[in-house]
């Protein structure tokens, strides 16, 4: 189904560009908004996003624009691919223009000073809008290069889910639906932290046993924390949980993995982030997640360990020693350990 109105994608980064391309390939007219006029002009003239998705052709149906007010006025379905640190600042002045719109967040992050997810910020800014999120094992370059990919659109608004599925579903991109918006979005935000740790472990040439342990214990931590906040634990067995965690913790294409790998090579955190040239949400998420887990008294030793390395001056060897000496816990939470 093709939308009668153009569809907006807010954000000129790699993921926003990949989603804009998918929409255009499905016959949609797309307005991709970005703040930088030079970037918009480069995409318009070269049909490529050289800053964030070099070598991938941008579909002719994608119109790069810089007039946000007009874009919001012209479009009903709006995909929001703005960094977590910028989303509120960009959209708050346009609150009135968002009434009755369908807003779908693509950003996997948490606002630093409030611990709010992006969909919660959208609800605050535009309480009359209809809100959804997209999350899953979705590396932007692989989507843009038409590798077979699946994602999850999550909302209690079934019509919104159906419209997003119709707009994005194609020969290489499959869209599943979920009603657990909170769990889907939280999984996408939390796994960024563990991807940094996975990159660090890879740079230190740790064995496959170790990497497998990190990923599975990360899943246990994520789920434990999310359930404490009201999410459905089953969500974390799907694409937005274990699926996203595996790809982000295994692929050098992941921005957060790259930051961790750079740290393992001996770079400082500032140098590692600077090398990226694009937002790695996991660094910001780690700070607020450590504070929130302490406040809620949720057991998250991997989060505490990575925080100690990045912000407390501990070495990886010191943290590993502490982790391995920790009290053994139950392997799988949420399943009774009796009666089997």
Curated annotation (Swiss-Prot):
Matching InterPro entries: 6-PGluconate_DH-like_C_sf (IPR008927), 6PGD_dom2 (IPR013328), G3P_DH_NAD-dep (IPR006168), G3P_DH_NAD-dep_C (IPR006109), G3P_DH_NAD-dep_N (IPR011128), NAD(P)-bd_dom_sf (IPR036291)
Its EC number(s): 1.1.1.94
Pfam families for this protein: NAD_Gly3P_dh_C, NAD_Gly3P_dh_N
Enzyme class: oxidoreductase
Pathway where this protein functions: Membrane lipid metabolism; glycerophospholipid metabolism
PROSITE patterns according to UniProt: NAD_G3PDH (PS00957)
Keywords carried by this UniProt record: Cytoplasm, Lipid biosynthesis, Lipid metabolism, NAD, NADP, Nucleotide-binding, Oxidoreductase, Phospholipid biosynthesis, Phospholipid metabolism
PANTHER family assigned to the protein according to its UniProt record, in alphabetical order: GLYCEROL-3-PHOSPHATE DEHYDROGENASE, GLYCEROL-3-PHOSPHATE DEHYDROGENASE [NAD(+)] 2, CHLOROPLASTIC
Binding site for NADPH: 14-15, 35, 108, 140, 255, 281
Gene Ontology BP terms: carbohydrate metabolic process; glycerol-3-phosphate biosynthetic process; glycerol-3-phosphate catabolic process; glycerol-3-phosphate metabolic process; glycerophospholipid biosynthetic process
HAMAP family registered for this protein in UniProt: NAD_Glyc3P_dehydrog
Domain of life: Bacteria
GO cellular component terms attached to this protein's record: cytosol
Annotated catalytic residues: 191 (proton acceptor)
Key word Oxidoreductase present: yes
Species this chain originates from: Pseudomonas aeruginosa (strain ATCC 15692 / DSM 22644 / CIP 104116 / JCM 14847 / LMG 12228 / 1C / PRS 101 / PAO1)
Reaction equations catalysed: sn-glycerol 3-phosphate + NAD(+) = dihydroxyacetone phosphate + NADH + H(+); sn-glycerol 3-phosphate + NADP(+) = dihydroxyacetone phosphate + NADPH + H(+)
Taxonomic placement: Bacteria, Pseudomonadati, Pseudomonadota, Gammaproteobacteria, Pseudomonadales
Primary site of residence: cytoplasm
Function: Catalyzes the reduction of the glycolytic intermediate dihydroxyacetone phosphate (DHAP) to sn-glycerol 3-phosphate (G3P), the key precursor for phospholipid synthesis.
Full protein name: Glycerol-3-phosphate dehydrogenase [NAD(P)+]
Residues at which sn-glycerol 3-phosphate binds: 108, 136, 191, 244, 254-256
Protein's cellular compartments: Cytoplasm
Family membership noted in the UniProt record: Belongs to the NAD-dependent glycerol-3-phosphate dehydrogenase family.
Molecular function GO terms recorded: glycerol-3-phosphate dehydrogenase [NAD(P)+] activity; NAD binding
């Amino acid at each position: 189904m093709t939308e009668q109105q153009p569809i907006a994608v807010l954000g000129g980064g790699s993921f926003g560009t990949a989603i804009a391309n998918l929409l255009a390939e499905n016959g949609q007219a797309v307005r991709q908004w970005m703040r930088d006029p030079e970037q918009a002009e480069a995409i318009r003239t070269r049909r490529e996003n050289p800053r964030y998705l070099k070598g991938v052709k941008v579909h002719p149906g994608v119109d790069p624009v810089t007039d946000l007010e007009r874009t919001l006025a012209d479009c009903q379905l709006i995909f929001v691919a703005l960094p977590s640190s910028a989303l509120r600042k960009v959209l708050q002045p346009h609150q009135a223009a968002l009434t009755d719109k369908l807003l779908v967040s693509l950003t996997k992050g948490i606002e630093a000073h409030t611990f709010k997810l992006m969909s919660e910020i959208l609800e605050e800014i535009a309480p009359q809008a209809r809100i959804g999120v997209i999350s899953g094992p979705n590396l932007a370059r692989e989507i843009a290069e038409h590798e077979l990919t699946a994602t999850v659109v999550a909302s209690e608004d079934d019509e919104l889910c159906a419209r997003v599925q119709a707009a994005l579903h194609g020969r290489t991109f499959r869209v599943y639906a979920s009603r657990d918006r909170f769990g889907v979005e939280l999984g996408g935000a939390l796994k960024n932290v563990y991807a940094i740790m996975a990159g660090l472990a890879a740079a230190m040439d740790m064995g496959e046993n170790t990497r497998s342990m990190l990923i599975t214990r990360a899943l246990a931590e994520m789920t434990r924390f999310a359930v404490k906040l009201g999410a459905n634990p089953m969500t974390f067995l799907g694409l937005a949980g274990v699926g996203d965690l595996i790809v982000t913790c295994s692929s050098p294409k992941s921005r957060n993995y790259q930051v961790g790998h750079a740290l393992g090579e001996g770079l400082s955190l500032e140098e590692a982030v600077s090398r990226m040239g694009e937002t790695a949400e996991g660094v910001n998420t780690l700070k607020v997640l450590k504070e929130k887990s302490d406040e809620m008294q949720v057991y998250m030793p991997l989060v505490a360990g990575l925080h100690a390395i990045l912000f407390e001056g501990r070495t990886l060897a010191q943290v590993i020693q502490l982790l391995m000496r920790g009290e053994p816990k139950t392997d799988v939470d949420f399943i009774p350990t009796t009666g089997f």
